[in-house]
């Protein structure tokens, strides 16, 4: 599977929309993802043997709901899918009505 397919597969069991870059639907909980960086490594014959994709996976939910279990479940799902153990940034948006969790992790492709 490609990196984006691995993200979608990891998030699918949670029953929330999961799309690249921008979600335009009406769900209260959803995931978007983007490539923060990608680079070659393990060079041989002037070509990379491996590409490392640094990803940001964004989970949005109502700010008035507890986020701890969501954070643990999503982090574990990404790690179990082969990503590095995600660092998580938690913030609120839209006048503190939306919680935005950013999971930052990498995977080799």
Per-region residue spans from a language model:
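A generic structural micro-feature
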Residues: 25, 47-52, 95-99
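Glycine-rich loops and low-complexity Gly/Arg-rich segments
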Residues: 44-45, 56-60, 81-85
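Oligomerization/assembly interface segments of phage tail-like spikes and tubes
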Residues: 51-63, 99-108
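Compositionally biased, intrinsically disordered low-complexity segments enriched in polar/Pro/Gly
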Residues: 1, 6, 43-49, 86, ...
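Small/polar-rich, solvent-exposed N-terminal microdomains that initiate assembly or binding
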Residues: 1-44, 70
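N-terminal short leaders/motifs
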Residues: 5-15, 50-61
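Acidic-leaning, charged glycine-interspersed low-complexity segments
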Residues: 72-109
């Amino acid at each position: 599977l490609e990196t984006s397919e691995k993200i979608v597969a990891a998030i699918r069991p949670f029953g929330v929309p999961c799309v690249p870059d921008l979600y335009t639907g009406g769900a209260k909980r959803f995931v978007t993802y983007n490539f923060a960086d990608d680079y070659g490594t393990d060079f041989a014959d002037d070509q990379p043997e491996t590409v490392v994709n640094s990803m940001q996976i964004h989970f949005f939910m109502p700010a008035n709901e507890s986020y701890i279990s969501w954070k643990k479940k999503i982090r574990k799902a990404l790690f179990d899918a082969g990503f590095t153990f995600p660092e998580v940034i938690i913030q609120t948006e839209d006048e503190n009505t939306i919680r935005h969790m950013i999971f930052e992790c990498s995977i080799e492709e």
